[in-house]
Amino acid sequence: MEYIKFDKARKMDIVPIGRVAIDFNPIDINKPLSESSTFKKYLGGSPANIAVGLARLGKKIGFIGKVSKDQFGEFVVNYFDNEGIDTSQIKYSKNGENLGLTFTEIASPTESSILMYRQGIADLELNVDEIDEEYIKNTKAIVISGTALAKSPSREAALKALELAKRNNTVVIFDVDYRAYNWKNSDEIAIYYSIAGKQSDIIMGSREEFDLMEKLITREKNSDEETAKRWLDYGNKIVVIKHGKEGSTAYTSDGKSYNIKPFPVKLLKSFGGGDAYASAFLYGLLEGWSIIDSLEFGSASAAMLVASHSCSQDMPTVEAIRNFIKEEKEEYGDMVARA
């Protein structure tokens, strides 16, 4: 069954909106961040990583956001240009706002943490006047990042993009992408997440992120099935609830559910997999694949990313993911990731 109908006549496939940052990942891994002294610079931020992931998979991708007017901002735009991502809707900050900086800790393959500098940053200064309806009208889907809702004026810009997408029958994908930075309190999180979640067509988030979104809706913590039903009843066609190393489940508007497990892989780090998962899953949907095949592709891409040093730079191609799945199935069996 085709749950999402993408307008194939449109120029762009997907346009993420929101956070773009600079990641500094330690070269000297397997030690605390306080002891790391050498880092490698990468493009970062979930929406930006998803954009790169989809571009690597051969899709026509744009990006709506704001970057600093300095060398880091130039790095982002040049990186996107080199990946074939349209940068016509990337604006430069005018009041000295900086790009967010992220320093990662890879203490062990299973112990990773992230230190973000998110004050006075450019991406949260995107304003409503910088959202172009014609651009949204010419893309099959937009990805709204939850971090774009954390603070004004980015909050209103993201919600305007959502409203324009609905008006122009552009598919809305809500990637919850919770980061504690910049939010004032949990009530604020619940309010704005719910606004986006009630108007989207696809929601992707972890169990913990859905708990934050539902804080003001219910006093009790819901089961995955109860959560999925709630957001499907609001009009979503697909709700994906992730449980990290336990796998994830996609719930669909016809009452069905599809489970996928992680592929066995030797971990290097425990972050970055979610963006690769989202990119490859959305690629499958754009290709018209079944939900389970799209989930499998996403799980494979995620496994490849957590075994590599970066998030953006190591996003795989379609051929690489297919080869990975083939090798995994030859070693572990055809049902290696399928629950």
From Swiss-Prot:
> Gene3D superfamilies attached here?
3.40.1190.20, putative 5-dehydro-2- deoxygluconokinase (2.20.150.10)
Q: Which reaction does it catalyse?
A: 5-dehydro-2-deoxy-D-gluconate + ATP = 6-phospho-5-dehydro-2-deoxy-D-gluconate + ADP + H(+)
Q: Can you provide one Gene Ontology molecular function annotated for this UniProt record?
A: ATP binding
Q: Could you say which EC number(s) this protein's record lists?
A: 2.7.1.92
Q: Keyword check for Endoplasmic reticulum, yes or no.
A: no
BP GO terms, sorted: inositol catabolic process
Listed InterPro entries: Carboh/pur_kinase_PfkB_CS (IPR002173), DKG_kinase_firmi (IPR022841), Myo_inos_IolC (IPR030830), Myo_inos_IolC-like_sf (IPR023314), PfkB_Carbo_kinase (IPR050306), PfkB_dom (IPR011611), Ribokinase-like (IPR029056)
Which SUPFAM superfamilies does the UniProt entry name for this protein?
Answer: Ribokinase-like (SSF53613)
Q: Which pathway is recorded for this entry? A: Polyol metabolism; myo-inositol degradation into acetyl-CoA; acetyl-CoA from myo-inositol: step 5/7
**Keywords of the record:** ATP-binding, Kinase, Nucleotide-binding, Transferase
Under Pfam families, the record lists: PfkB
Q: Write down the HAMAP family for this protein, in alphabetical order.
A: IolC
Family, according to the entry, reads as follows:
Belongs to the carbohydrate kinase PfkB family.
Q: What does this protein do?
A: Catalyzes the phosphorylation of 5-dehydro-2-deoxy-D-gluconate (2-deoxy-5-keto-D-gluconate or DKG) to 6-phospho-5-dehydro-2-deoxy-D-gluconate (DKGP).
Q: Name it.
A: 5-dehydro-2-deoxygluconokinase
